[in-house]
Amino acid sequence: MKLVILLVVVSAMLVLGGAQTASQFYCGDFLARTMSILCWPDMPKRSGSQYAGYGWPWLPPFSSSRGKRGIVDECCYRPCTTDVLKLYCDKQITI
């Protein structure tokens, strides 16, 4: 009986531990929300109307944060982990 309980606990740890490091595709709104949760978990959500006046011609260009590849190259076109996403938290994000 103790062996069965031990096997169940070890199996649960493996399943839960593997879920945290699994690679996944992060694109569009899902990428933005995930970055928001990872980088700024305590920030309150803002409404979209605050950004209505901002658009492409007025936004400054971003510099590369990890060479020529950006977060979309690493996590939208190819699967990546949350550990890779966290590398972009303190940097300007390139699309």
Curated annotation (Swiss-Prot):
Q: What is its main location?
A: secreted
As given in the record, the signal peptide range reads 1-19
Disulfide connectivity for this sequence is 27-76, 39-89, 75-80
GO molecular function terms listed in the Swiss-Prot or TrEMBL record: growth factor activity; hormone activity
Keyword annotations for this protein, in alphabetical order, are: Cleavage on pair of basic residues, Disulfide bond, Hormone, Pyrrolidone carboxylic acid, Secreted, Signal
Q: Does the keyword Signal apply?
A: yes
Specify whether Signal is a keyword of the entry: yes
Origin, by domain of life? Eukaryota
Q: Which Pfam families does this chain map to?
A: Insulin
Q: Where in the cell is it found?
A: Secreted
Entry's Gene Ontology cellular component terms: extracellular space
Q: Which residues carry this modification: Pyrrolidone carboxylic acid?
A: 20
Q: Which InterPro entries match?
A: Bombyxin, Insulin-like, Insulin-like_sf, Insulin_CS, Insulin_family
Instruction: Tell me its family.
Output: Belongs to the insulin family.
What does it do? Brain peptide responsible for activation of prothoracic glands to produce ecdysone in insects.
Assembly and partners are described as: Heterodimer of a B chain and an A chain linked by two disulfide bonds.
Leftover remarks? Silk worm has two kinds of PTTH: 4K-PTTH and 22K-PTTH; there are many forms of 4K-PTTH.
Know the name of this protein? Bombyxin C-2
What high-level taxonomic lineage is stated for the organism?
Eukaryota, Metazoa, Ecdysozoa, Arthropoda, Hexapoda
